[in-house]
A protein has these predicted regions:
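Conserved AdoMet
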Residues: 2-120, 244
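Conserved class I S-adenosyl-L-methionine
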Residues: 115-127, 153
Length: 287
């Protein structure tokens, strides 16, 4: 045990160019995420940290481990938590949420309250975006003096991120982006300095694991709102188009798709119309 502990503190050898390409290909094949040569040090550090925990001394041995059947699948899931970016915040890119509020008011005026509203946060990370969507929907109810059912689905590939989203507990720093009135209405102190989303809002949000490469098999359909912000930047351009085409198919007629500004500038879909607002990159489905 002592020898292993001493070994775990020793630095791993740098990745060779061949090893980097092998890991780069595995990550892209399984998740679609592209790790550029400029981010080799990030990949090496992420792998190295996990390898030290396991006492694995070289990249080839660890590669065999994560590709070894069911046991490899479990280890791959643990590794993904290190490799996927989980930094996000509430109401990230405010203009998108301003658009959402306007859209929901118009949507309700058009279809009425009998139709349940379905919202989807793709790449929801630790939950800040789906809870932001839920807050906007809840506030729209209050503003319009109406009551209707709405539900928010958050999906992500990282199990640890989803666990955080389901826990719905956040540090005070996370709430800096939330208006004081909303923070008071939708969060309650935990007693340890952190804050938890109130049950009445949390019960509107459901989080599930989903690899965006498997959107063709996703059960979501007839969505009124889909947010896919700050996710597409990690994929090749052809893959971005493929993902967006799949998401467009999941929209209800009149539904809203919001993506990150600058993430896809040359994409068009025959069933969608761009939203005329230069602050956002969004589309509505015809019909």
């Amino acid at each position: 045990m002592q020898a292993e502990g001493v070994w775990s503190l020793q630095p791993l050898a740098d990745m060779s160019a061949t090893e980097f390409r092998v890991w780069q290909a595995l990550l892209e094949d399984r998740t679609g995420i592209v790790v550029s040569a400029e981010r080799q040090s990030f990949l090496q550090t992420s792998l190295g940290g996990r390898m030290r925990e396991l006492g694995v001394g070289d990249y080839a041995s660890y590669y065999r481990r994560v590709t070894d059947g069911p046991h490899g699948a479990m280890e791959w899931s643990s590794l993904l938590d290190r490799l996927t970016v989980q930094e996000t915040r509430f109401f990230r890119h405010r203009p998108s949420f301003d658009l959402l509020a306007t859209y929901l008011r118009e949507r309700l005026a058009e279809i009425g309250t009998a139709h349940p509203l379905k919202l989807w946060s793709v790449g929801c990370s630790s939950g800040e975006e789906p809870y932001s969507l839920a807050m906007v929907a809840a506030e729209t109810q209050v503003e319009m003096g109406l009551s209707w059912y709405f539900g928010v689905t958050g999906t992500d590939i990282s199990l640890s991120a989803l666990n955080k989203a389901r826990e719905a507990i956040y540090s005070p720093r996370k709430l800096d982006e939330v208006d004081a009135a909303l923070a008071q209405r939708y969060f309650q102190p935990c007693g340890d300095g952190r804050y938890q989303v109130v049950a009445s809002l949390a019960e509107r949000v459901c989080c599930a694991r989903l690899n965006v490469l498997e959107l063709a098999r996703a059960p979501m359909s007839g969505m009124d709102v889909i947010f896919c912000q700050n996710l597409l930047i990690y994929f090749r351009r052809w893959r971005r188009r493929e993902i967006l085409n799949r998401l467009a198919e999941r929209l209800a007629p009149g539904g809203l798709l919001v993506i990150g500004v600058g993430e896809m500038v040359d994409w068009h879909h025959p069933a969608l119309e761009p939203v005329a607002d230069e602050r956002v990159l969004a589309f509505t489905r015809k019909g």
